[in-house]
Amino acid sequence: MTELNAGNAASFRDQVRAALVEAQNNIDIDLSQVEFVDSAGLGSLVALRKTACERNGKVRLINPSPHVQQILELTRLHRVFEIVRL
């Protein structure tokens, strides 16, 4: 996926939630191929963080592209999510 936007954000969120097994607390999301994210995409990431927090877990955003990293910083979400560079 190269974009996380209003057209696919709800589907993305639902697919990630469906893939979670009961004992899984943490969610790792590879953003290395995502070049664009809008407010709906950010909302889906925040919703997944809420899901993880309800399980006493966290969301890690893996290798966000420079543009996505900039959006995370502009929205201050880089303070909410753990950003991991591998």
List the predicted regions and their residue ranges.
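C-terminal structural segments of small proteins and small subunits
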Residues: 51-85
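Short, glycine-/small-residue-enriched flexible loop/hinge segments at domain edges that mediate gating
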Residues: 17-38
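Hydrophobic helix-cap positions at the C-terminus of alpha-helices
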Residues: 19, 48-52
